[in-house]
């Protein structure tokens, strides 16, 4: 069994007498107590709860993270991620997962609001190979890449057995139609509870409320969000605790699964060159993005001694 050696308590959740009582009990068990001024909902959404002598405490060690440009990238692999999804799905309803790459990390580094959104997610997964590579160089040997398209495939593959229901939000009606066909062919028994292609413009408050009601009425377990970064992360954060499912932003995964875009060969994925393959597919849209963010990331890692 796992031994708790250190508990961290949100400052505003306990009064002084309760803190002293918890500290005294914890010390009897050889456990260190820290008090930090953070929001309790942030802690509860990212951590696993435990008890010491019947008292509620918080253990922040459930998910190890590596700070990359101010973004807390989870140290994980696909197996660990899938295990967490299965064990925490009910607790994480209404929350969201970000799938981070160099572009989103550099954007978050320069945009405090977007950085908060990334760090407020239950997980910011290392979709980009350079992120997991950086984590390993920082001593996190277990850090592996977990891409949005691969995660969606893995979840869909076990969904019939688990009874999980899926909603797809984003992309075009044509892509969603292809996506439904491919998912039903490849993953027999998977329940697609619904799909929605939102307008490119910003929805009115009334339209947005109606969309949320339609999503929740289908009772999904997962809402896959394919709006592209940073739009999809902003959408998920704005709908936290409104959409009653776990939201996962997966970018181009809809297009990959539908067959609109081919993924890079495995050798390119393994050598962190998937960005180059995508650049060759769509140079007009991606050239300036990759030039800007990749150079900034390389400069940052160089200054960090990596």
Where do the language-model regions lie?
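Proline-aspartate-enriched helix->loop->beta-strand connector
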Residues: 3-6, 215-229
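N-terminal nucleotide/polyanion-binding subdomain common to many enzyme families
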Residues: 63-150
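A transmembrane-helix-recognition feature enriched in membrane-embedded lipid enzymes
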Residues: 63-71, 130-137, 263-306
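Conserved beta-alpha
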Residues: 136-218
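N-terminal hydrophobic signal-anchor/signal peptide
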Residues: 1-71, 239-248, 252-258, 262-266, ...
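Short glycine-rich anion-binding loops that position phosphate/pyrophosphate groups of nucleotides
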Residues: 12-14, 39, 102-105, 227-232, ...
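Conserved acidic residues
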Residues: 5, 122, 193, 221, ...
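Short, well-ordered alpha-helical microsegments
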Residues: 16-19, 82, 176-177, 231-236
């Amino acid at each position: 069994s796992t031994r708790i050696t250190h508990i961290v308590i949100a400052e505003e959740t306990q009064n002084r007498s309760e803190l002293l009582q918890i500290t005294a009990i914890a010390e009897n068990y050889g456990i260190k107590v820290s008090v930090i001024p953070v929001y309790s909902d942030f802690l509860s959404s990212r951590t696993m709860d435990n008890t010491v002598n019947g008292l509620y405490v918080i253990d922040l060690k459930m998910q190890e993270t590596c700070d990359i440009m101010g973004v807390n990238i989870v140290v994980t692999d696909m197996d660990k991620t899938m295990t967490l999804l299965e064990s925490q799905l009910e607790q994480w309803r209404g929350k969201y997962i970000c799938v981070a790459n160099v572009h989103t990390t550099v954007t978050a580094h320069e945009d405090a609001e977007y950085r908060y959104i990334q760090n407020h997610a239950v997980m910011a997964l290392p979709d980009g190979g350079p992120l997991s590579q950086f984590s390993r160089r920082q001593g996190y040997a277990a850090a592996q890449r977990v891409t949005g398209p691969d995660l969606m495939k893995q979840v869909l593959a076990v969904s019939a057995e688990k009874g999980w229901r899926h909603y797809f939000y984003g992309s075009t009606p044509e892509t969603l139609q292809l996506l439904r066909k491919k998912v039903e062919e490849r993953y027999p028994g998977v329940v697609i509870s619904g799909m929605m292609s939102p307008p490119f413009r910003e929805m009115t408050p009334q339209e947005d409320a109606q969309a949320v009601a339609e999503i929740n009425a289908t009772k999904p377990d997962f809402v896959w969000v394919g709006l592209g970064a940073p739009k999809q992360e902003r959408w998920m954060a704005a709908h936290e605790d409104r959409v009653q499912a776990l939201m996962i932003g997966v970018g181009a995964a809809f297009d990959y699964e539908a067959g609109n875009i081919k993924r890079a060969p495995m050798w390119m994925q393994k050598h962190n060159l998937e960005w180059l393959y995508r650049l060759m597919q769509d140079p007009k849209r991606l050239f300036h993005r990759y030039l800007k963010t990749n150079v900034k990331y390389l400069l940052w890692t160089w200054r960090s001694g990596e």
